[in-house]
A protein has these predicted regions:
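Pepsin/retropepsin-fold aspartyl endopeptidases
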Residues: 1-121
Length: 121
């Protein structure tokens, strides 16, 4: 298994932007912005939420929202406000909002097969 990184741009509510190299993490629910990035684009916490680390350790982090732009598209997404030393992560909520899925074999992002459901006659 390899790691997949993707370059993106994040924008805060006042229009400030920052470039970010995201680690695509299909095990992370929300995307995460390092402290230096979310402070640069002037994000503020909307709520505090509990998360579990990969080893099962519970932590609490602030959550906000920002505009995320990738080569495949852009959207508004919730983001965890990381602390010093945290790495930028692109989580599955952002991927799903953008209609993207990570192919685990090629380690590339591809358009998601979008199913609307059945149609009634």
């Amino acid at each position: 298994m390899g790691l997949t990184f993707i370059e993106g741009t994040v924008k805060g509510p006042a229009g400030k932007e920052a470039s970010v190299e995201f680690l695509v993490d299909s095990g992370a629910v929300y995307s995460l912005l390092p402290e230096s990035v979310w402070k640069e684009i002037e994000l503020t916490a909307k709520r505090r939420q509990r998360f579990l680390m990969a080893d099962g350790t519970p932590i609490e982090r602030d959550v906000s929202e920002c505009h995320i732009e990738l080569p495949q598209g852009d959207a508004h997404s919730p983001v965890i406000l990381g602390q010093a030393g945290d790495e930028a992560l692109l989580g599955v909520v952002t991927l799903e909002i953008l209609g993207l899925v990570l192919n685990p074999f090629t380690r590339k992002l591809h358009p998601m097969r979008m199913i609307l459901g059945s149609q009634r006659s």
